[in-house]
Amino acid sequence: MPMMKLKYALLLSRIPMLALGQGDYEIVDPNLFYPREPVTPYSQPSPNATGMGGWDVAVARARRFVAELTIEEKVSICTGNGFPANPSIPHHTCQGNISPIERVNFTGLCYTDSDTGIGNSHSYGTGFPAGVTAASTWNRELIRARGYAISTEFKAKGVHAVLGPVLALARVPGGGTNFEGFGADPFLTGAAGYETILGHQGAGVQAEAKQYLGYDGQQYNRTYYSSNIDDKTLHEVEIWPYAEAVRAGVACVMTSYPYVNNSQASQNAYLLNDVLKTHLGFQGYTQTDWFGLKSGVSAILAGLDQDMPGVAFSQTDNNSAWSYYGANYTAAVKNGTVPEWRLTDAATRIMTPYFWLGQDRNYPSVSLEDDPRRSITNAQRQRHRMVAREVAAAGMVLLKNTPGKKGLPLVKPTAIALFGPAAGQNPYGPNQYGLGPSADPANFELPLGYGPTPLTIGIGQGTLAVGGGSGSTFYPRLEDPISAIQQRANQDLTLVDWSTTTNLTMASFVARRATACLPVVASFSGEGVDRNLSLLHNGDDLVATVANNCDNTIPIVQSVGPVNLEAWIDHPNVTAVIWANLGGQELGPALVDVLYGAVNPSGRLVYTIARNDSDYAQPHIMTTPQPYPQLNYTESISVDYRGFERNGKDPRYWFGHGLSYSNFTYSDLVVKTHAGLSESLKQPIQYVADAPGGDSRLYDVAIVVEFQLRNEGPWDGTEIPQLYLEMPPEAGNPTKILRGFDNVQIRDGERQNVRLFLTRKDISYWDVVGQTWVVADGTFTVLIGASSNDIRLKGTLII
């Protein structure tokens, strides 16, 4: 496979076969792994869209439209017409394209990354915080607002579908694309995905839930490994977020690269036909990840509706005729191998969201350019910058604090000093994170570092606003911590100094002269790039050096995921720690908001931070080629915090942890069943989908939980109460599981009543024998806490 231009190969493309380690580049021969065409049996024909759940009008319109098309035209709707590198597509436009059909006034479809803003082009759009940051707000309203703002800009640029949100769980902490998703828990991921989809589609843009299924973030061999998942885990953990996406009315579900139980995801009939289209009642369409298709007829019959980008990765001339779909699809229909009704339904499903969202009426023309001098439409809005800043601030997690004369919030400090490359701007520009001194891969290293020594040079110049790959975006502006803090410090006549090198002697010198020291450290990964759990540029040494010379050291961690903090977290001079996640273009002002108390921190971790890397249930990622690599989900449903609890491991910071400048107390818990249930809770029901998301009875409110929250001060603030559930032994769930949360704003000294609801599905387990959701007999324990380990209230209910 030839290397592409570097910015696509490392930052912005979908790389199916890139293995990176210790600064090396290795293109893996696919023939080392799976045969090219494993045949997947399918259990039933792909079901037609029915129009249930309010989709009936759109489905009817799509059917009338498709009825006018020829076989070739229907196939063209199901087959992308090339990757942006295609020289016939000027100035690098959409990541995926469906050709127009002029005779029926269809102008085509445009698909583009990313879920942090308009990606892969200098398109004058806002650079939003990453998915992991949005989830860290635990704020449904704000998550939806982010999705709406992103897609408002997509629509202004004429894009029909945003390639997100990512609903894959951060199962492996070092997985390269974990930052694109919403963390390690299926319930939280489902809730964040639900709100994001409502935001995107509320703006009139199609959302795509990805990557379905068995994609745990790790990049090495990602197109060839098999994720082997037992049935209980499949339904209770992996599929859970996608059920929420379907319930939100998601337009498209994108399949993943890996195999699932040794059946390639894009031709896995059980996942596509049985689970998604039948049991969940999905009315939209399925689509491959880019270059993710490995078969034609098998995938079509298994329920795969659309191939993207419609050409083979190896076809540098983007010959659209070379595709598993395209002309081969047409031939398969005409010779009877594929029934035409299957093609008709696929095209109907693709067109249904187009009509459902009104994209056939006065939709803007595509205005995406790789050259900013050619851009026609500036999609930025001041209110979008405000949303980006609010999400970035609300997504920052205060891990540690010793309030008073030291720690946070800052109160007119005499002298502030910032340290490390991540504190300032990248000398090569805000959109060149990773390019280093030249565009030659030999000139810089990657943060994979599987050996014991963290990498100290190379990529990672400047402040880290987002991870790499197709989940990133270009920034029209990027305000770093130094610039933002200088502006705020000027109000107090505070001296501001900095050292953005990795020189520890200089850091020592600068630290001794400051009353508040802020080392800014980072951990980077991206599509095609996994990582270890160490900080870039010997960040541990930087923090320790600063702390040895400054008695008020406040590290700021910009990270794509968990890192090991043990080298310095207990240092007596480390008075506070801000986990900044990935803040997007407004990260600097958002950081100032939290540091100075304009925003009382309310972010919570969406994964657990371990004391030892080996304490994670799945600590390792593949680093060497293996024949037929198998990833066995041996932890079963015990993901993240559940695994730590089950295995008796005490992490540094538990899932859901986060401090505030205020103190909150919990009281007066009441747990009761809901009077409006449609049927007895104990009755195992054979559920049949009657709405997108599955049988509507699953979403009956079963239990109502009420309690009191009081803000003891001294600040107005926001608390994130979390509801965990322990089920009876029959359910087979060995630990508590997240089943609810809220984002409660309370003034200093005030009290507020909080009410949370548990649905029938929330309190059910997946019966692998009966193949249905069942409510166990016995005692349910409801736990209300400030994190997965900080439980404040406990109640029980016998069912």
Spans of model-derived segments:
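A glycine-anchored, Pro-Gly-centered beta-turn/N-cap motif
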Residues: 771, 776-778
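Short beta-strand elements
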Residues: 790-799
